[in-house]
């Protein structure tokens, strides 16, 4: 009679080979780089839009000369990191603490500017409309004026937000939008946003 004892090892010896092959395949899948993930990040350049002022740091007090108690000059502003594809910039300056930061009831708008060239890089202190970069437009603040209106809080210390938007479109020339109208116009066109906040409390 032919013995079958020797056949068992030959059959079971194939199992480890199959398992090793399967594990090798799974291991290869686990460590293989994702082509999709690589293609999404390859060549990507992260650029952060930044807005600064030499007059005050973010969160610090705004100097008196930029307020109604001083010379009412707009502070010097500088920006960098506008993303590729930015056609222009829009700037809104407002105070969400009006009239009393303890019980705010409205946001008071101090300055509205649009179609700023991204390449301009800065605005000088106290810049007049005629000295703005070519093609720049201005809107209406809550005094119904087109020029900068400095902090003039009736009660307490208020926060003043300088908000800069990088846009993928140019807005109509010769337009004098309110803040609300400008915000509506830029919806869906904002590539990046930067913010600078300063505070002010009247000295008397």
Protein language model regions, located:
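N-terminal secretory signal peptides that target proteins for export/translocation
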Residues: 1-13
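The N-terminal extracellular segments of secreted preproproteins, especially immediately downstream
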Residues: 9, 17-19, 67, 151
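Bacterial N-terminal signal peptides
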Residues: 16-30
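N-terminus-centered regions that define maturation/targeting leaders and the start
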Residues: 33-204
């Amino acid at each position: 009679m032919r013995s079958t004892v020797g056949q068992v090892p030959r059959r079971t010896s194939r199992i480890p080979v199959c398992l090793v092959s399967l594990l090798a395949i799974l291991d290869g899948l686990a460590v293989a780089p994702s082509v999709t993930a690589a293609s999404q990040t390859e060549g990507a350049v992260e650029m952060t839009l930044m807005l600064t002022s030499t007059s005050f740091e973010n969160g610090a007090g705004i100097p008196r000369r930029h307020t109604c108690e001083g010379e009412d000059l707009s502070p010097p502003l500088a920006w960098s990191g506008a993303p590729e594809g930015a056609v222009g910039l829009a700037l809104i300056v407002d105070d969400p603490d009006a009239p009393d930061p303890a019980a705010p009831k409205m946001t008071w708008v101090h300055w509205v500017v649009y179609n700023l060239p991204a390449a301009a890089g800065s605005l000088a202190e106290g810049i007049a409309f005629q000295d703005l970069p070519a093609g720049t437009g201005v809107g209406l603040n809550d005094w119904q004026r087109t020029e900068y209106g400095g902090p003039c809080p009736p009660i307490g210390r208020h926060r003043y937000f300088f908000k800069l938007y990088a846009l993928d479109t140019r807005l109509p020339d010769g337009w004098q939008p309110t803040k609300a109208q400008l915000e509506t116009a830029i919806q869906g066109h904002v590539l990046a946003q930067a913010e600078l906040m300063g505070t002010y409390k009247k000295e008397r």
